[in-house]
Curated annotation (Swiss-Prot):
Gene source species: Cereibacter sphaeroides (Rhodobacter sphaeroides)
MF GO annotations: identical protein binding; lipid binding; tetrapyrrole binding
Keywords, in A-Z order: Cell inner membrane, Cell membrane, Lipid-binding, Membrane, Transmembrane, Transmembrane helix, Transport
Name of this chain's protein: Tryptophan-rich sensory protein
GO CC aspect terms: membrane; plasma membrane
């Protein structure tokens, strides 16, 4: 399969939506004061992980977009990207942990559906999506644990 740079860069640009919300709504004093699980990664891990994931996601989507019958897979891709974009404003902006948990759980379902659909069309595209599903699983767990460990705070139940 050929590397279609225009297509790759288009998908990478689409990752700019969640990247922008992440850059604009960074963890703040509120987040610093939350009780978090012992396995919560240090802050510097997040931009490195997301940069790597956006690259892999874009490469996978580029491969799939070149194939016949990729419409459903790309619809799943767009949906997971939309929920990815939504999570940061809900969690960090609105400080609504329970609502953010619902958002990240739906995102996880679309990430899993995207990975499955990609595997059906192109094995390498599916493989490229595996790290994202692992990261989304960890993110869901972190959101749940932040909510659970801070249940006495009103924003945990919102």
């Amino acid at each position: 399969m050929n590397m279609d740079w225009a297509l790759f860069l288009t998908f990478l640009a689409a990752c700019g939506a969640p990247a922008t919300t992440g850059a604009l709504l960074k963890p703040d004093e509120w987040y610093d004061n939350l009780n978090k699980p012992w396995w919560n990664p240090p802050r510097w891990v997040f931009p490195l992980a997301w940069t790597s994931l956006y690259f892999l996601m874009s490469l996978a989507a580029m491969r799939v977009a070149q194939l016949e019958g990729s419409g459903q897979a790309l619809a799943f891709y767009a949906a997971q990207l939309a929920f990815n974009t939504l999570w940061t404003p809900v969690f960090f902006g609105m400080k609504r942990m329970a609502t953010a948990l619902a958002v990240v759980m739906v995102m996880w379902l679309f990430v899993a559906a995207t990975m499955w659909a990609f595997f059906q069309l192109d094995t390498w595209a599916g493989v490229l999506f595996v790290p994202y599903l692992i990261w989304a699983t960890a993110a869901t767990g972190l959101n749940f644990e932040a909510m659970r460990l801070n249940w006495n705070r009103p924003e945990a139940r919102a």
